[in-house]
Amino acid sequence: MIQLQKIIPDLLFPRRCAVCDDISDIRGQGVCSKCQPRIVYIKEPCCMKCGKQLARQEQEYCRDCSRNKHFFIKGTALYDQGSMAESVFRFKYGNRPEYARFYGRDLYEKKRGFLEQVKPDALVPVPIH
């Protein structure tokens, strides 16, 4: 009976890869094996204000943060804009709440040090523009 309880949800609501959205056996991963290498994470150096990847190590702020005032103290980013744009759009606007586990785990694994250092009062998603 316990096995049936685990199988039925997968039959009714098959798991989808958070990158390509294909139905896939991704138990615990969130992303299929063919898509895992396609994810591009932002690496250092990063903007000290918003977290965008910078071209040069000696830069402190990106072009946008150098020129504009923002209404937040510090931000961070996980993915390069292009690699996960469609996935983030589906998650936010395409009724894919099942991606939340993948995004939450990925954020925790990759940005745990930052989050522990900053101790944010809230994690706020940014609108896609």
Task: Please report, for each region that a protein language model flagged, where it lies by residue.
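Glycine-rich phosphate/pyrophosphate-handling loop used in enzymes and phosphotransfer proteins
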Residues: 1-129
